[in-house]
């Protein structure tokens, strides 16, 4: 599982960008979310996700908000 931050949300097409802690950027679509709706996401929000290569770079999937410490 990777950890990163949502850097950009495109609300009109329901997709966005995530940057991991190593600086790699991955795109994602609303279908890649796990137990959260696209409208609940915020830019600069910390998230956990899986990543795989795609024709457009990297694709993030199984995206979910990073659990707060102690939970």
Identify the residue ranges that each predicted region occupies.
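Structural detector for short beta-strands of small beta-barrel domains
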Residues: 1-11
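A generic beta-sheet turn/junction motif
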Residues: 11, 21, 53-55
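Residue-level recognition of conserved beta-strand positions in structured domain cores
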Residues: 18-20, 30, 51, 62
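Short acidic/polar mixed-charge low-complexity motifs
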Residues: 22-24, 45
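A short macromolecule-binding patch
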Residues: 24-32
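Short nucleic-acid-contacting surface segments enriched for D/E, G, S/T with interspersed K/R
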Residues: 34-48
